[in-house]
A protein has these predicted regions:
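Short small-residue beta-strand/loop micro-motif enriched in glycine and branched aliphatics
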Residues: 195-198, 250-251, 424-425
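A conserved structural/catalytic subdomain of Rossmann-like adenosyl-cofactor enzymes
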Residues: 4, 290, 294-518
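N-terminal hydrophobic or amphipathic segments with adjacent small-residue motifs
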Residues: 29, 229-231, 259, 347, ...
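Conserved S-adenosyl-L-methionine
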Residues: 201-302, 307-316, 322-325, 336-337, ...
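A generic secondary-structure signal for well-formed alpha-helical elements
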Residues: 40-53, 194, 223, 247, ...
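Non-catalytic, mostly N-terminal accessory regions of nucleic-acid modification and defense proteins
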Residues: 1-219, 277-286, 291, 386-390, ...
Length: 518
């Protein structure tokens, strides 16, 4: 599908979202809109899959379920249901498909009860199956009784019906071979648009595509194919999907604390065509309840919440993730708790890249102890990349990317890149353009030194700076100003004073001519 048609799908979906906006917050109408889009996608996907499975039987999915029941029909129905659950993870009976709901809408029926049952039936179809964890509670955030949808039941039914009818008019391209790229791209666009309007909440579920691209490119360098990729604070899963796509990862793993965002991440995986058996997204607090034990991964990426609080409980002094660093990360700034957690899950030949506030580079006390441990004792720090300010939704603070490897050699240097001035301002947001991303990735790949942009610092140099990683200590971006000619400035001032005197006299003459002064 051409870029023009992709943009058309984006615009159509965003227009549908605006039908729901009303008095809702950006995050509220996001979950309704994306949930309905996902429901339509699942419906179209299973109808196509079932029809393909029934080609030899010369009957369609809907026709089969409309037939009068007998033993042969029931056996064929059960066979189709089993085949669907085993291959795509779920099942929807024809009368609960999106298309069946819209047919009811056109008959002016109240569709909220059957829509609610339809969403529940999708989840229930996976009970006891391998896909249960990926579908359980998936639609729990779609509350069709919510007053946000309208004051009365009729108001709610009218609004939801209008949204579903608008979606019904949009071709998702499920019949096309490139379906995943088309709808996946549109879904990502929708999430980014919601993030733009969500303010501070945006950081909870979305990493800008430009930053995701840098992280993904870095962790996949040197790997023709990743076995797996992991994000401990995965949000909507966009960063995970980008890394998995670039690295051709076989499996995707993530954890997300917010239950609503966790549902969004699972939807995002399925809608991008990731088979239920190839991803595992867990709901829970990564630091307090690690869902992945001692599992290690080829690539680890993350955009953890900046300077979040955590318990820093005494029990963590005996936790293998944190115990060797000498100190726990402070209770009010968990940045290094996330970093140590990620390193624990990184395998010996892997690469980890995460976003963090600049404070992690220079703050002292416990964080200084941990930073020194990672540099002096472990030699894990591979690169520090300074990003422009105001590139994340909801915060204008400058950020950096930290890159870690466990397989560094003793004499390896640490690469510092100052990309803080490379951006394009678009309205109130700064954006990294493709050439800026390429420059960062190329500089990292080649480990190049570029004047006023990058520097390779020896471990000795870092030690002499007391393990302070603040980028200006290593990359001199100072621009000398041209020397000022004092005598020329004085001469110019005198000439301006003469001109001012002449103008005063000229103005006074005009005022006299007008009789305004004597």
């Amino acid at each position: 599908m051409s870029e023009e048609l992709q943009q058309k799908l984006r615009d159509q979906l965003w227009e549908v979202a605006n039908k729901l906006r009303g008095n809702m917050s950006a995050s509220d109408f996001m979950y309704f809109t994306l949930g309905f889009i996902f429901y339509k996608y699942l419906s179209e996907k299973i109808e196509k899959h079932a029809n393909d499975a029934l080609v030899d039987d010369e009957v369609t999915f809907k026709e089969l379920w409309a037939m009068e029941k007998d033993t042969d029909i029931e056996e064929l129905q059960e066979s189709v249901k089993t085949e669907c659950i085993e291959n795509i993870g779920y099942f929807i009976e024809p009368n609960f498909l999106f298309s069946s709901i819209t047919e009811s809408i056109k008959k002016k029926e109240n569709i909220l009860p059957i829509l609610e049952r339809s969403l529940k039936r999708i989840e229930d179809s996976t009970l006891g199956q391998d896909s249960e964890e990926d579908f359980g509670g998936l639609f729990s955030d779609i509350d069709l009784a919510s007053p946000k949808l309208g004051k009365t039941a009729d108001d709610k039914n009218t609004l939801v019906s209008n949204v579903l009818l608008a979606l019904d008019d949009i071709d998702f391209g499920v019949e096309a071979s490139q379906e995943i790229d088309i709808l996946g791209d549109a879904y990502e666009y929708m999430i980014s648009q919601f993030a733009a309007g969500a303010g501070k909440k945006a950081g909870e579920f979305y990493t800008p595509q430009e930053v995701s691209r840098i992280l993904a490119e870095i962790v996949t360098l040197g790997h023709a194919r990743l076995r797996n990729v992991y994000d401990p604070t995965c949000g909507s899963g966009s960063l995970l999907l980008r890394a998995a796509s670039i690295g051709h990862a076989n499996e995707i793993f993530g954890q997300e604390k917010n239950p609503t965002t966790y549902n969004l991440a699972r939807m995002n995986m399925l809608l991008h065509g990731i088979k239920f058996s190839n991803f595992r997204i867990e709901n829970g607090d990564t630091l307090e309840a690690d869902a992945f034990g001692d599992t290690q991964f080829d690539a680890v990426v993350a955009n953890p919440p900046f300077s979040a609080e955590w318990s820093a409980a005494d029990k963590f002094n005996n936790d293998d993730r944190f115990s060797k660093a000498g100190r726990l990360a402070p209770r009010k700034t968990a940045d290094y708790a996330f970093i140590l957690h990620m390193l624990y899950h990184l395998n010996e030949g892997g690469t980890m890249a995460c976003v963090a506030p600049h404070g992690v580079l220079f703050r002292g006390n416990a964080e200084g102890v941990i930073r020194r441990f990672l540099i002096e004792k472990k030699n894990y720090v591979d690169a520090i990349i300074g990003l422009p300010a105001n590139i994340f939704y909801g915060t204008s603070i400058p950020t950096c990317i930290l890159v870690f490897k466990k397989c560094r050699k003793e004499d390896d240097s640490i690469l510092f890149i100052d990309a803080s001035k490379d951006f394009e301002k678009i309205k109130t947001q700064n954006k990294l353009r493709p050439q800026h991303i390429l420059k960062i990735v190329d500089t990292y790949r080649e480990r190049k030194e570029i004047e006023k942009y990058s520097h390779l610092a020896t471990l000795q140099e870092v030690a002499e700076n007391d393990y302070n990683l603040n980028i200006p200590r290593y990359v001199d971006t100072f621009e000398e100003e041209e020397p000022i000619d004092i005598h020329a400035v004085i001469k110019e001032i005198k000439e301006l004073e003469v001109k001012r005197t002449d103008l005063d006299k000229e103005i006074e003459g005009y005022l006299k001519e007008l009789g305004l002064v004597e």
